[in-house]
A protein has these predicted regions:
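Active-site clefts of carbohydrate-active enzymes
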Residues: 2-37, 69-70
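Structural recognition of the beta-strand scaffold that forms the well-ordered cores
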Residues: 14-19, 43, 49-53, 152-153
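Solvent-exposed loop/turn segments at secondary-structure junctions
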Residues: 21-25, 56-59, 157
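A structural motif corresponding to the C-terminal end of an alpha-helix
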Residues: 3-13, 45-47, 82-94
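Carbohydrate-binding surface patches
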Residues: 112-172, 206
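C-terminal beta-strand-rich structural cap/linker in extracellular carbohydrate-active enzymes
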Residues: 192-214
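Solvent-exposed beta-hairpin/edge-strand motifs
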Residues: 168-185
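Aromatic/acidic polysaccharide-binding cleft in carbohydrate-active enzymes
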Residues: 33-88, 101-112
Length: 214
């Protein structure tokens, strides 16, 4: 995805990603969290379009298990409801991201000092409770057509949720709003754990949240 992002931004070309939502060859049937991870990682890296493989289960010997969004019998599989939930989020975030240009990407892995990796982003620091697992995040930074910065924070683990404490890089006179994944509207930042220091922003396994700063 890094090389795709570099080339798409260099040539001002829209990048699309095409990924599995069914078992295929040596690839196992993805969970909803794994599909969500593929979708959000694509968005963090600046993708402007996404395609599922496959919408309707193909025929032939290569796909004996079936299992696409629509089965060979024409009935909806459980992937249909998964794609519907993910697509709702995509519709909300897409309204903002289609008006954004990717400016930076940071990957925070276990052992990193987040504040050092996030200097070019709209996030100043990410901290964790001492009982939580080490950091594992993707952070995409964008320039919105309004002049504001957009930041997408993603949990890079698809097997565990995350509960980070996030400090944004907010300059005097600016504020942070979140894009509601249900409605696409700008909503005030909400601290999920007011009894803890800082602002806690939980993330689903493979999940992401989108913010505007300005």
């Amino acid at each position: 995805m890094a090389s795709v992002r570099i080339n798409s931004t260099s040539y001002s070309a829209a990048a699309w990603n095409f990924f599995n939502i069914m078992p295929y060859g040596p690839h196992t049937d993805p969970t909803e969290a794994q599909v969500r991870w593929q979708v959000n990682a694509s968005l963090v890296y600046g993708a402007k379009g996404l395609l599922y493989f496959c919408y309707f289960t193909p025929g032939g010997d290569e796909f004996p298990k079936g299992g696409a969004i629509i089965g060979q019998d024409g009935l909806k599989t459980y992937h249909y409801a998964q794609a519907k939930r993910i697509n709702k989020m995509l519709q909300s975030y897409g309204k903002v991201l289609m008006d954004c240009t990717s400016t930076d990407i940071a990957q925070i892995i276990p052992g990193d000092t987040p504040s050092e990796k996030l200097r070019q982003s709209g996030i100043r620091d990410i901290k964790r409770d001492r009982v939580d697992p080490p950091h594992d995040y993707l952070v995409g930074t964008f320039r919105h057509k309004s002049g504001r910065r957009a930041v997408m924070l993603m949990n890079n683990r698809f097997a565990y949720s995350a509960w980070p404490t996030v400090e944004f890089d907010v300059r005097p006179g600016q504020r942070v709003v979140e894009i509601d994944p249900e409605t696409g509207r700008e909503v005030p930042l909400h601290d999920a754990s007011p009894l803890m220091d800082g602002v806690q922003l939980p993330l689903l396994d493979g999940g992401a949240r989108l913010f505007l700063i300005g």
